[in-house]
C-alpha cells in the first residue's frame, strides 16, 4: 500500500477544542482502518504543523477522501504528501536514463 505523510495544523476551532484532540485522533484511526488503511504513526509536533501522521492507504483517491473528510469537520487543515520508502526510491532512481 502507498505511504503518506499527513501534515496537520489546527484551525481556530480545533485549538479551542484541543482537549478533544485525542478523541478525534481515535476517530481518525477508525476512519483510516474502515477505508482499508493503517495509521502507522502519529506525532505532536512543534513548528509550522501541529501534528504529523504516517498513513498507509489503499490508493491516492481513498487517502484524499480521508483528508478532505477530516478537513470538512473544521478542526484541522491538512497537507498530504505521497511518500516513497527506500526500496521504491531506489527503483525510481534506477529507471532514470
Residue ranges and their predicted role:
Residues 36-43, 78-80:
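A short linear hydrophobic-aromatic micro-motif
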Amino acid at each position: 500500500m502507498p505511504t503518506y505523510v499527513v501534515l496537520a495544523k489546527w484551525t481556530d476551532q480545533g485549538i479551542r477544542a484541543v482537549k478533544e484532540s485525542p478523541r478525534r485522533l481515535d476517530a481518525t484511526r477508525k476512519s483510516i482502518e474502515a477505508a482499508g488503511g493503517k495509521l502507522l504513526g502519529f506525532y505532536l509536533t512543534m513548528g509550522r504543523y501541529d501534528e504529523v501522521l504516517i498513513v498507509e492507504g489503499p490508493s491516492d483517491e481513498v487517502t484524499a477522501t480521508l483528508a478532505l473528510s477530516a478537513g470538512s469537520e473544521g478542526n484541522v487543515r491538512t497537507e498530504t504528501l505521497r511518500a516513497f520508502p527506500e526500496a521504491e526510491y531506489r527503483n525510481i532512481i534506477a529507471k532514470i536514463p
